[in-house]
Amino acid sequence: MTVLEAEDLSFGYGDRPVLDGVSLAVEPGAFLGLVGPNGSGKTTLLELLIGLRRPDSGTVRLFGSPAHERADGERVGYVAQDTAGTGDAMPVTVAEAVRMGRYPRRLRGRFDAADRRAVEDAIERVGIADLAERRVGRLSGGQRQRVLIARALAAEADLLALDEPTVGVDAESRSAFYDLLGSLNEEGLTVVLVEHDLGVVTAHAGEIACLNRRLYFHGDPETFVETDALAEAYGTDHRVVSHGH
């Protein structure tokens, strides 16, 4: 089953059109990078794809159901931009925050050994086991984003949607963060990433969708850098700086 499918999708804020006739599909196990200039509609498209907004026209299906119905919302892990104060809004420890990912599965029952193992495994997989008892508010931006990924893993999410998750994160932590995403994707997790850094996307994503109100390209990174889609979408001689290892 296709994870995400958008057909002839259009959306605007009042009289200002943001997306026009966007169609794309995301298959299980894909790593899709959404790129485009500032104000191109990347974040809006991501929010539409996972059902946080409803389109003005067109359709979006998430795991086969209308995305806005959120019928499979527990299968989606969403990591938004980390902003000042995010940690203060979560006055809990890392382990407690990750444990929240199990709540939808325990509305009618108590946490058991399987839940505890799922939380511990998720924390271990994202490399923050040594921070399990630390308050989220005391973490760095990159560490907080790992907590959100761990929460999605604890929830056994099938799709991880991220909106520029490393804004304000130092270069070394950024590199480690994207290596983590690559590893999780190799394990079978579907990833959709909004990112302004074209070099990061071409180095890590298996597919690229380039948009600026409309979709200019959807395909593999190698083909993307050889087409005119970059210049057409950005309206300038934009260069891709590789961040490969």
Regions flagged by a language model, labelled:
Residues A95, R99, A113-L131:
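Conserved ABC ATPase "signature" region
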Residues L160-E164:
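Catalytic Walker B motif of ABC-type/P-loop ATPase nucleotide-binding domains
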Residues G58-E74:
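Conserved ABC transporter NBD signature motif
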Residues I50:
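Helix-to-loop junction immediately C-terminal to a conserved catalytic motif
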Residues A152-L153:
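ABC ATPase C-loop
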Residues L4, V18-L19:
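Conserved structural motif at the start of ABC-family nucleotide-binding domains
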Residues E195-H196:
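H-loop/switch region of ABC-family ATPase nucleotide-binding domains
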Residues G206-P221:
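H-loop (His-switch) and adjacent beta-strand-loop-beta switch element
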